[in-house]
């Protein structure tokens, strides 16, 4: 019996974040592709209009851990809801995004928690 799209979607839906990460890496290696978002070239006139609009989605990026690594891991767990191992892996891999596509208030709150823990944070 052949595997259907629904079977695949059901299997992917049951995976944890770490399992999905491993799956993406396996796809990248097997097919020689990248899961990174492709940049779309903007029209010359659109660049000025885009700059005039206020940014509504922000990415909180852990730039440097600092001296209090344990405190930063606790802050990452609180912000993201990740398990201990996943949060430690994220902190060990800095610079890495902690939250992506969040509003300004959530980005500011996450930045404050991480900086209070001793980390250096960028919001983009």
UniProtKB/Swiss-Prot annotation:
GO terms for cellular component: cytosolic large ribosomal subunit. It holds the Pfam family Ribosomal_L12. One of its GO terms (molecular function) is structural constituent of ribosome. The keyword Ribosomal protein applies. GO terms for biological process: translation. Keywords: Ribonucleoprotein, Ribosomal protein. It comes from the Bacteria. The keyword Ribonucleoprotein applies. Signal peptide: none annotated. PANTHER family: 39S RIBOSOMAL PROTEIN L12, LARGE RIBOSOMAL SUBUNIT PROTEIN BL12M. Forms part of the ribosomal stalk which helps the ribosome interact with GTP-bound translation factors. Is thus essential for accurate translation. Belongs to the bacterial ribosomal protein bL12 family. NCBIfam families: L12 (TIGR00855). Homodimer. Part of the ribosomal stalk of the 50S ribosomal subunit. Forms a multimeric L10(L12)X complex, where L10 forms an elongated spine to which 2 to 4 L12 dimers bind in a sequential fashion. Binds GTP-bound translation factors. This is Large ribosomal subunit protein bL12.
């Amino acid at each position: 019996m052949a595997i259907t799209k629904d079977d695949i979607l059901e299997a992917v839906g049951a995976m944890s974040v770490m399992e999905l990460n491993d799956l993406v890496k396996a796809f990248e290696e097997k097919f020689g592709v990248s899961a990174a978002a492709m940049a779309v070239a903007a029209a010359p006139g659109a660049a000025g209009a885009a700059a005039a609009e206020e940014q509504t989605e922000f990415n909180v990026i852990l730039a440097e851990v600092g001296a209090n690594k344990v405190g930063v891991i606790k802050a990452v767990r609180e912000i993201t809801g990740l398990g201990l191992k996943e949060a430690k892996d994220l902190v060990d891999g800095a610079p890495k995004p902690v939250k992506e596509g969040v509003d300004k208030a959530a980005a500011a709150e996450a930045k404050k928690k991480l900086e209070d823990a001793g980390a250096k944070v960028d919001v983009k």
